[in-house]
Amino acid sequence: QEGNPKKRLFRLQEDNGIINRMGFNNAGLEAAIVQLKKNKKQLIIGGNIGKNTETPSEGYTADYLECFEALHPYVDYFVLNVSCPNVGSHAKLNDKDYLEELIKAVQSLNATFEKSKPILLKIAPDLNDTQLDEIIELVAMTKLEGVIASNTSISREDLKTDDTTLESIG
């Protein structure tokens, strides 16, 4: 998929920060597999998978499962990225019931392979305490191998960069 329109990366000099609006720009699953086949197993490779920008909510799980199955032979672990603020509507991805369904679906698929792979969950930094508690409970219940905290924040609080500049870049 194309990702978000360019410019997608903005430096905030006064804040020693960056605004990232990449949007999962990439050449696609097949192109990734071509590159991964070149790996001579000298490195540990992780598969960071997420929904496509255009995928409607009823297709989210299918996106994850398709990527998981196709990449399984080529990666050492997986990251279920449910935290990218740059791929359109992602509120459902942080819903406890949906997350449980997604994790269990991926774990079921993982169990069909001769060698299962570790699965981690990448979460957003802007979750509220209730959401964090639910995710911690879910990670413990499903016995995921870990959590990656965190992805890009959508918060623009406490920045030195002036509001006019922030509005002009997003």
Where are these regions (language model features)?
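Flexible glycine-/small-residue-enriched beta->alpha junction loops
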Residues: 2-29, 35-39
